[in-house]
């Protein structure tokens, strides 16, 4: 009788163990599936990289939904910035945003220079208007600083030289999901041998040998949404309180009307 009870107990433990292991594997499968979905969602945009001639976007269709008015061809918005904290509590950030209207085949935006303090006092922000013609950035505002002027006129978006054909090789990412928004995040370790990392090191002052982290963020439906948002960040930060990163995004939305501006 005692032996039969032990057998029943033993079988119960085995069944419980299998159930726990099965749940664990199920969670792993779900996380792997979400990782693949996030990569697939980004691939729709990243497969377009590198976009050496930004004017190609005038003829490039994006994801369309009910937010688009009839006849609206939409607008591509491309963005790149470089953020660096040289001093504790202070963040220096420079970059450009450009809106390419497919209806008018015109591209306008601005180059920004920000200095942001933790307490927000003495924070500084300056925008310089730009437009693009014949794939060339044209500065519309007067800039006295010759070095800054050259940086603006020679600026290249990350999407113009980035190449993510090997996106599938980024594996075992740290995936987090906020179903209330919804939003999705995935982080992948990169190698200093990665061509994208080499490109960034050649273009920006990155005083660390630390291999960066690739961060993908999506707000909205994974399948696509004109009101959603995708952001790519390559983070070289050495410590939690320091910042050294490049942020890139390319999004397709309804074109802005003059009344909206």
Curated annotation (Swiss-Prot):
Compartments, record wording: Cell membrane
Keywords of the record: Cell membrane, Lipoprotein, Membrane, Palmitate, Signal
Lipid modification (S-diacylglycerol cysteine), residues: 23
Ranges in a coiled coil: none
Signal sequence bounds: 1-22
Protein known as: Uncharacterized lipoprotein SAV0440
Any one GO cellular component localisation term in the record: plasma membrane
Lipidation (N-palmitoyl cysteine): 23
Main localization of the protein described in the UniProt heading: membrane
InterPro entries: Csa, Csa_sf
């Amino acid at each position: 009788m005692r032996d039969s009870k032990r057998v029943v107990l033993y079988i119960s433990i085995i069944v419980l163990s299998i159930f726990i292991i099965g749940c664990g594997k199920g969670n792993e499968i779900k996380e792997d599936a979400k990782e693949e979905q996030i990569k697939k969602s980004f691939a729709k945009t990243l497969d377009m990289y590198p976009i050496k001639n930004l004017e190609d976007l005038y003829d490039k269709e994006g994801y369309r939904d009910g937010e688009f008015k009839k006849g609206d061809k939409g607008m591509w918005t491309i963005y790149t910035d470089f953020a660096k904290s040289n001093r504790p509590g202070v963040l220096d950030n420079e970059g450009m945003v450009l809106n390419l209207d497919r209806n008018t085949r015109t591209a306008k935006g601005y180059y920004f220079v920000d200095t942001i303090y933790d307490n927000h006092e003495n924070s500084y922000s300056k925008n310089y208007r730009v437009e693009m013609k014949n794939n060339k950035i044209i500065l519309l505002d007067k800039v006295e600083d010759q070095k800054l002027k050259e940086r603006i006129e020679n600026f290249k978006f990350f999407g113009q030289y980035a190449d993510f054909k090997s996106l599938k090789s980024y594996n075992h990412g740290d995936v987090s999901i906020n179903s209330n928004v919804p939003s999705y995040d995935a982080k992948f370790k990169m190698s200093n041998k990665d061509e994208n990392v080499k490109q960034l090191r050649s273009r920006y002052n990155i005083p660390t040998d630390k291999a960066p982290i690739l961060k993908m963020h999506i707000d909205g439906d994974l399948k696509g949404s004109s009101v959603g948002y995708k952001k790519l960040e390559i983070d070289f930060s050495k410590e939690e309180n320091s910042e050294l990163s490049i942020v890139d995004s390319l999004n397709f939305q309804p074109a802005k009307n003059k009344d909206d501006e």
